[in-house]
């Protein structure tokens, strides 16, 4: 993509209302534009990051055997009354009426819709287990939206719903999603910490939050220092049983491990999984015939990942004082190609044409060298190919690793071959 043909409205100065790094850089790097409190337009560069995060999630969810669907944003209140949650949910739910004066709502979550989706079709234990997921926009009317996409009112979420005939099957589904989440977050460059959590308004009796470590996190995490070692082994039962909790669940007096063994860090929540048995299937009459001929309520779980929130979390975890440092799998473009002067345009064009255009953002603008370098560092593409005067005199370009800052000279053909091979 040629920058001269692209829409990338970057900002030189830090917006006064943006308090944390991810919010500042999201605005400055031209990822988002605020439309109202907690509501944003996703600009082209930010949308590419969102799509890359979606692709990772979709790939791992599909590998787990989950099946993608798409449920409506606007839901009838009747389903929430049927489950008993309509009056309990509170002011976070945006309630509306249609032209027929029917009560509707903009979905903050989709347990009721998911239960309704299968209850008239899934009737036998032979139809289970089943796991459906979607990637869909949601709305929660936060009292104080803040921190940009980290705590917005409108947000993109991956939510999945598992259906099983009994507790044993439901626990297998839960453990499978736990393992899938570990894989998803590791692909994004994170060290995810799964902590025991309160079930909140979703309900149920088993729940884990997934956090990534970041100094600006809202939660304080307490976890056994063996956690990282177990994470590499992906031993789910050990990961679930090892001590790892957030501040609201930590009691120093009853903590089962010593202070020497206890790590304390700030974290950002990026995912949450729940097992809630028949909390929804019972009132909504979603049941199946079991293998022994009995009619039993379906055991359910739900599994959420904040997709748009992940953009902010990634920036919080991967940045420096110059800008964002995108991990390669989520970067909007892999390479930033910088043309430093008019007389090297032919060489820069040659490189651009030789590489995949959807992986390269080619700065072919007439701005100053300083502006070009600053903008490319700000938007944080993993690699920069810098085409200066040596490209003409010696057939040499500079290749910069954004994460390490290391700059290496390469012959033009060598650089083309290096990035074409990956």
UniProtKB/Swiss-Prot annotation:
<dbReference type="Pfam" id="PF00587">
    <property type="entry name" value="tRNA-synt_2b"/>
</dbReference>
<dbReference type="InterPro" id="IPR002316">
    <property type="entry name" value="Pro-tRNA-ligase_IIa"/>
</dbReference>
<keyword id="KW-0067">ATP-binding</keyword>
<dbReference type="InterPro" id="IPR006195">
    <property type="entry name" value="aa-tRNA-synth_II"/>
</dbReference>
<keyword id="KW-0436">Ligase</keyword>
<keyword id="KW-0547">Nucleotide-binding</keyword>
<dbReference type="InterPro" id="IPR044140">
    <property type="entry name" value="ProRS_anticodon_short"/>
</dbReference>
<dbReference type="InterPro" id="IPR004500">
    <property type="entry name" value="Pro-tRNA-synth_IIa_bac-type"/>
</dbReference>
<comment type="subunit">
    <text>Homodimer.</text>
</comment>
<dbReference type="InterPro" id="IPR036621">
    <property type="entry name" value="Anticodon-bd_dom_sf"/>
</dbReference>
<dbReference type="InterPro" id="IPR023716">
    <property type="entry name" value="Prolyl-tRNA_ligase_IIa_type2"/>
</dbReference>
<protein>
    <recommendedName>
        <fullName>Proline--tRNA ligase</fullName>
        <ecNumber>6.1.1.15</ecNumber>
    </recommendedName>
</protein>
<dbReference type="InterPro" id="IPR050062">
    <property type="entry name" value="Pro-tRNA_synthetase"/>
</dbReference>
<dbReference type="GO" id="GO:0005829">
    <property type="term" value="C:cytosol"/>
</dbReference>
<dbReference type="GO" id="GO:0005524">
    <property type="term" value="F:ATP binding"/>
</dbReference>
<keyword id="KW-0030">Aminoacyl-tRNA synthetase</keyword>
<comment type="function">
    <text>Catalyzes the attachment of proline to tRNA(Pro) in a two-step reaction: proline is first activated by ATP to form Pro-AMP and then transferred to the acceptor end of tRNA(Pro).</text>
</comment>
<dbReference type="Pfam" id="PF03129">
    <property type="entry name" value="HGTP_anticodon"/>
</dbReference>
<dbReference type="InterPro" id="IPR004154">
    <property type="entry name" value="Anticodon-bd"/>
</dbReference>
<dbReference type="GO" id="GO:0004827">
    <property type="term" value="F:proline-tRNA ligase activity"/>
</dbReference>
<keyword id="KW-0648">Protein biosynthesis</keyword>
<dbReference type="GO" id="GO:0006433">
    <property type="term" value="P:prolyl-tRNA aminoacylation"/>
</dbReference>
<dbReference type="InterPro" id="IPR002314">
    <property type="entry name" value="aa-tRNA-synt_IIb"/>
</dbReference>
<dbReference type="InterPro" id="IPR033730">
    <property type="entry name" value="ProRS_core_prok"/>
</dbReference>
<keyword id="KW-0963">Cytoplasm</keyword>
<comment type="similarity">
    <text>Belongs to the class-II aminoacyl-tRNA synthetase family. ProS type 2 subfamily.</text>
</comment>
<dbReference type="InterPro" id="IPR045864">
    <property type="entry name" value="aa-tRNA-synth_II/BPL/LPL"/>
</dbReference>
């Amino acid at each position: 993509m040629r920058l001269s043909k692209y829409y990338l409205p970057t900002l030189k100065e830090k917006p006064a209302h943006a308090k944390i790094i991810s919010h500042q850089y999201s605005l400055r790097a031209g990822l988002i534009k605020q439309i109202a409190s907690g509501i944003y337009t996703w600009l082209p560069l930010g949308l590419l990051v969102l799509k890359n995060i979606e692709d990772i999630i979709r790939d791992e969810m599909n590998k787990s055997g989950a099946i993608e669907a798409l449920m409506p944003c606007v839901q009838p209140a009747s389903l929430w009354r049927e489950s008993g949650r309509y009056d309990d949910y509170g002011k976070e739910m945006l309630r509306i009426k249609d032209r027929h004066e029917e009560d509707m709502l903009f979905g903050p979550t989709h347990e009721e819709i998911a239960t309704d989706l299968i209850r008239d079709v899934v009737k036998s234990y032979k139809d289970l287990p089943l796991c459906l997921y979607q990637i869909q926009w949601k709305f929660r009317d936060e009292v104080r939206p803040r921190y940009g996409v980290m705590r917005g009112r409108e947000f993109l979420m991956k939510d999945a719903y598992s259906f099983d005939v009994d507790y044993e099957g439901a626990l297998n589904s839960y453990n499978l999603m736990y393992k899938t989440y570990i894989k998803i977050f590791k692909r994004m460059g994170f060290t995810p910490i799964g902590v025991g959590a309160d079930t909140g308004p979703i309900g149920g009796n088993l729940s884990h939050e997934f956090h990534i470590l970041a100094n600006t996190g809202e939660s304080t995490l307490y976890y056994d220092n063996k956690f990282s070692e177990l994470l590499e082994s992906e031993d789910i039962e050990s990961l679930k049983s090892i001590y790892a909790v957030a501040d609201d669940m930590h009691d120093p007096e009853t903590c089962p491990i010593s202070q020497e063994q206890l790590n304390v860090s700030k974290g950002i929540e990026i995912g949450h999984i729940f097992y809630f048995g028949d909390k929804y299937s019972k009132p909504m009459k979603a049941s199946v015939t079991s293998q022994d001929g009995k009619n039993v309520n379906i055991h359910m779980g739900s599994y959420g990942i904040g997709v748009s929130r992940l953009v902010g979390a990634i920036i919080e975890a991967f940045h420096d004082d110059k800008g964002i440092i995108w991990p390669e799998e989520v970067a909007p473009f892999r390479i930033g190609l910088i043309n430093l002067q008019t007389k090297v345009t032919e060489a820069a064009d040659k490189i651009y044409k030789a590489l995949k255009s959807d992986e390269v953002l080619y700065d072919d603008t007439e701005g100053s060298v300083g502006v070009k370098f600053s903008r490319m560092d700000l938007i944080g593409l993993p690699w920069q190919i810098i085409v200066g005067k040596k490209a003409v005199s010696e057939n040499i370009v500079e290749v910069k690793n954004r994460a390490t800052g290391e700059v290496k000279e390469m012959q033009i053909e060598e650089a083309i071959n290096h990035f074409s091979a990956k």
